[in-house]
């Protein structure tokens, strides 16, 4: 057993000593005054990592993913499905529901599963990216799939991504806005259409500046509409590849506490370079990038929240803003209370140094070694 002492949070609060299970029969103390305690990170857009993919529909793999993510400093996540056909969506939903149920009886370290996110299949084929175009559906079919999944697994779905310029999209927003977080993604929407989406109940932008119309001086597109919608959130992949660091600084300046950092990681995260499957499509992971197709288009990422935190701080973004975008804001979007620094019998918190490098992780009262392959 390990007793952690002299713990201070990023807002200067002194946190009572914490006892953590370090796997040892001996009792020891560790002075944490050289580090800052921050809440566990929450990844609200992640397909997989460590060789596991939620879209495979395997409950054992979802559980293995949940047990592995604390090494990235993640205490909660929203498993995200690729664009799949109905049978595979329902199979994957069942696997996530089973994983949630089975983890309730597990006493070790794991990242809590917040529900399920559907990235598709109601997306624009012009901006489908690595999403399988053969599985895209119209609005009526999308509603049928949602309703069937809701009937079989009530309350599991928490978030859906749609392209609001497609026929029937606004009806979907009206129908589901009180049930799910609805995010604009993989879309050819212009400013006016995106503004209507936000005005009618949509409240989020999926991986900003990727798989959508660009933000131009006379055509501000979805990003401009999100800026003008004060209750909306903007998620961004901060791997230094999907969005340039200067643009990241701009986004944090413009959107302030509305920024949500996501990984959009696929199964190659935390794994060696190689060829990996993503929603039925072969993707090459090489040198921290993921590619697919003859044009070498980006296909998700292999980053993780601990890498993103350190990277954003190195770009000049204030530490408190980085931490909030990784902890409080993604939970707020899903209406989840952040209790990670409130103590309790099974605390979850990260210890970071002055560069936001992850140094120690406490996951549900267990000491976890950080994954530091940067």
Segment roles from a protein language model:
Residues 58-61, 92-95, 218-223:
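Charged helix-capping and loop-helix junction motifs
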Residues 9-17, 318-323, 332-364, 370-371:
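Acidic, glycine-enriched loop/beta-strand segments at the rims
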């Amino acid at each position: 057993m390990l007793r952690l002492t002299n713990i201070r949070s990023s807002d200067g609060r002194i946190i009572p000593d914490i006892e953590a299970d370090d796997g040892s029969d001996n009792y020891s103390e560790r002075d944490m005054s050289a580090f800052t305690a921050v809440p566990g990170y929450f990844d609200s857009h992640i397909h997989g990592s460590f060789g596991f993919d939620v879209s495979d529909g395997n409950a054992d793999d979802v559980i293995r993913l949940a047990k592995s993510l604390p090494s990235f400093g993640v205490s909660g996540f929203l498993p995200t499905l690729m664009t799949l056909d109905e049978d595979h969506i329902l199979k994957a939903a069942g696997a996530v529901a089973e994983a949630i149920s089975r983890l309730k009886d597990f006493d070790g370290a794991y990242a809590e599963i917040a529900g399920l996110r559907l990235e598709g299949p109601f997306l624009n084929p012009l901006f489908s990216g690595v999403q399988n175009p053969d599985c895209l559906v119209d609005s009526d079919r999308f509603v049928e799939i949602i309703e069937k999944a809701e009937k079989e697994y009530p309350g599991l779905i928490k978030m859906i991504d749609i392209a609001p310029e497609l026929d029937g999209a606004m009806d979907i927003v009206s129908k589901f806005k009180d049930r799910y977080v609805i995010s604009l993604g993989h879309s050819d929407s212009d400013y006016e259409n995106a503004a209507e989406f936000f005005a009618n109940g949509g409240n989020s932008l999926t991986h900003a500046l990727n798989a959508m119309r660009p933000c131009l001086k006379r055509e501000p597109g979805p990003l401009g509409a999100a800026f003008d919608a004060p209750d909306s959130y903007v998620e961004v992949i901060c791997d230094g590849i999907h969005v340039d660091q200067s643009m990241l600084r701009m986004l944090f300046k413009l959107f302030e506490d509305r920024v949500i950092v996501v990984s959009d990681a696929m199964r190659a995260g935390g794994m060696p370079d190689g060829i990996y499957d993503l929603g039925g499509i072969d993707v090459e992971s090489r040198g921290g990038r993921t590619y697919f197709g003859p044009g070498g288009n980006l296909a998700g990422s292999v980053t993780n929240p601990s890498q993103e935190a350190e990277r954003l701080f190195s770009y000049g973004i204030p530490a408190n803003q980085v931490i909030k975008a990784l902890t409080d804001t993604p939970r707020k979007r899903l209406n989840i209370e952040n209790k990670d620094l409130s103590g309790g019998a099974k605390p979850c918190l990260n210890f970071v140094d002055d560069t936001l490098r992850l140094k120690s992780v406490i996951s549900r009262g267990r000491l976890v070694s950080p994954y530091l392959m940067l």
